[in-house]
Amino acid sequence: MADAQLPPGWTLQRIRDVSGDQGAIVLDSNRAAKWVASDPHEVLHPEIVLGFHSLCIVKPVDDDDWYMGSLYDDGSIDCWTAYDDLYEALRGL
């Protein structure tokens, strides 16, 4: 997990508290991710990935939005909704 990182100003416990998921984890950002709400699908380049069982929240490089999506067994992510800030994304889980 050398590439795994927390968002600036956040702790893992705060992420767990806000999301209500005590099993939340920080995942390696080196994985395939795409925005499937557009056609054609847009490739996302994750900077931060937070895992919540079969869901995840992704913050792409050079993008201020947070994308929620499905986390698959192979580690890939399909994102289908976006939030302006992390707090709202966590509450939307």
Predicted regions and their residues:
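Aromatic-residue detector
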Residues: P7-W10, G75, W80, L93
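Short linear motifs in intrinsically disordered/low-complexity regions
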Residues: A4, Q22, S29, D63-D64, ...
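A short, charged, amphipathic alpha-helix used as a generic interaction element across diverse proteins
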Residues: Y83-L93
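Short aromatic-glycine-(Arg/Gly/Cys) micro-motifs in beta-strand/loop hairpins
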Residues: I15, G51-D78
